Amino acid sequence: RRTAIELGADNAPYVVGAADQGGYADVISPPSSRPLQNGDVLMLDTGCVWDGYFCDFDRNWAIGQADELACRAYDVLWRATQAGIDAARPGATCRDLYVAMSTVIAEIDDSGGEIGRLGHGLGMQLTEQPSHAIFDTTVLKENMVLTIEPSLSYGNGKMMVHEENIVVSEGQARLLTERAQPELPMI
């Protein structure tokens, strides 16, 4: 939070996260006195405000090392995020973004995912319409600000989520966040 404000954010109202061996079971977990351990996957989600506008993003890290399944889940999630970014063009629909991401997610998570969303609008509120969901046929327009936020389930009750912020533009969506590394970072 302090770093975000030092780098120019007016406010960083929250930092939430989760961590456990090989992955986490919930995106927003209550605080725990359990120390991080070798093999944990840590996710932090934060939002900042600048001049009244929100950003909303998260990142994942492995503590020490990651098991093969967590690395595979991260790879699928990174590629699903890229599919969402690539699909975000004027004239596409939120459903198109959802389908692009869920097609990649299905490589590891065959739960179907017909409930929920894989991103949302972003602006003067942290979460705005539209929703990247199977039911949302909102047509994307140039200069819309969106999150690309795929999530997936894997292993025995584990999940992983990733989030980037973009501006819809002709040709290619423009990232507002620094794109996460293509491989699960180890710290």
Task: Please give the residue ranges for each predicted region.
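Active-site neighborhoods and metal-handling regions in enzymes and metal-associated proteins
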Residues: R1-I187
